[in-house]
Amino acid sequence: MSTLMVQGTTSDAGKSTLVTALCRWLWRQGVSVVPFKPQNMALNSAVTADGGEIGRAQAVQAQAANLAPHTDMNPVLLKPNSDTGSQVIIHGRAVTSMNAVAYHDYKAIAMQAVLASHERLKSAYQVVMVEGAGSPAEINLRAGDIANMGFAEAVDCPVLLIADINRGGVFAHLVGTLELLSPSEQARVKGFIINRFRGDLALLQPGLDWLEARTGKPVIGVLPYVLDLHLEAEDGIDQRQVGKVEQLLKVVVPVLPRISNHTDFDPLRLHPQVDLQFIGPGQAIPAADLIILPGSKSVRGDLAYLRSNGWDRAVARHLRYGGKVLGICGGLQMLGEQVHDPLGLEGAAGSSPGLGLLAFETVLEEEKQLRNVSGRLSLENAAVSGYEIHAGVTRGPALELAAVQLDDGRSDGACSADGQILGTYLHGLFETPAACSALLRWAGLEAVQEVDYHALRERDIERLADLVEHHLDTAALRRLCGL
């Protein structure tokens, strides 16, 4: 049983993607492999089979390893709820919120959870494929580190260092990162991977030769830049769109400061008949067929932000002209009359008026609802599956006209009597082809092409494994995996 860790010279160097690729590459060879990220900071999360939540990148990596997501795959998840603080989730459950200084002192406790999860995974699988966080060379974060070299040293595992050449300065990134590590950590780095290369590899070869001579460490391979790879983004919103046909449905999503689970919109971004626009601060909401209010980690704060940009008036105007509005999770709560936070779970305790578009109120409670669900939309009785991650309890007469009837007997969300407004707690509802098509028809698209988002993701995972096979030193990788 062995552990191999991927660390990056920067954020977005390609760590998540490489771990996904390696998981599928090993799984195709019959190796039992499991993804693992000691500590993740993200507002995009997934619900696990054991009823907790982990970063969505680890859920995608689990799919690559043909496993159901489990809380041991990401034992520490930090979900920012302010500029200086985060909700701390240990083994899938929210335990507290704290600022960065307090969390620094809490790391020793978090590390116990990390090591316990790693030990369980190591005893159950041939290979634990680990993803680091950010860069291991952040000097101010090295004391008490549990996400990068602190973890690697604790479990005595080899490390691969990946860097993004498309950003420029790849040799400075690799050599500089190595120089800032301690001697024992430097020895732990067993090779380099260069990511997102465009052009003739022969022109890069002198640089690779220099790097190996300078560091004494091998280049395991150079991965090409792939333009049309569409796995879920963990942090920043991916705004790339595929080629579109002429008949387009215009969908607008206002980007809120604490937007969460923006991966909800990936199926729309990839749909050939949807023109998806993310609207930022100071921008007016343009004419559209559908406005979607997204999930939020700070609903009252994001409501205030929405109003400060005049987007509440834009939503009202949109409805007057016959447009459709969809609220997802926090967006559902915003559609109601009041949002109450008596415990101060998302900031200062208090209440805020909602948009007043549906007759209900929401009270934020400490116990978070975490579950994978399936059921039927009120629209066309279309099959839908998704997941709930919310701390609010919503009550009011508008809920009598439910948006979803769940298979467990509960109803979810609400619809307006005129059919223009729909709200639901379900994340991921556009991933189910039938539900996505029904929602697009409701929003005004007539001849809807059905798109299977899960099949698209599976295709891209397979392509990643092919890249490992064709561009990396697979013999070296197998040795590092103890195979």
Curated annotation (Swiss-Prot):
Taxonomy, superkingdom: Bacteria
Keyword Ligase annotated: no
Pfam families: CbiA, GATase_3
CDD domains: CobQ_N, GATase1_CobQ
PROSITE patterns linked: GATASE_COBBQ
GO biological process entries: cobalamin biosynthetic process
Keyword DNA damage found: no
InterPro entries, per the entry: Class_I_gatase-like, CobQ/CobB/MinD/ParA_Nub-bd_dom, CobQ_GATase1, CobQ_N, CobQ_synth, GATase_3, P-loop_NTPase
The protein's annotated pathway: Cofactor biosynthesis; adenosylcobalamin biosynthesis
Keywords from the named record: Cobalamin biosynthesis, Glutamine amidotransferase
MF terms (GO), sorted A to Z: ABC-type vitamin B12 transporter activity; catalytic activity
Protein family per UniProt: Belongs to the CobB/CobQ family. CobQ subfamily.
Annotated HAMAP family: CobQ
NCBIfam families: cobQ, PRK00784.1
Function, in words: Catalyzes amidations at positions B, D, E, and G on adenosylcobyrinic A,C-diamide. NH(2) groups are provided by glutamine, and one molecule of ATP is hydrogenolyzed for each amidation.
Protein name: Cobyric acid synthase
Record lineage: Bacteria, Pseudomonadati, Pseudomonadota, Gammaproteobacteria, Pseudomonadales
Gene: cobQ
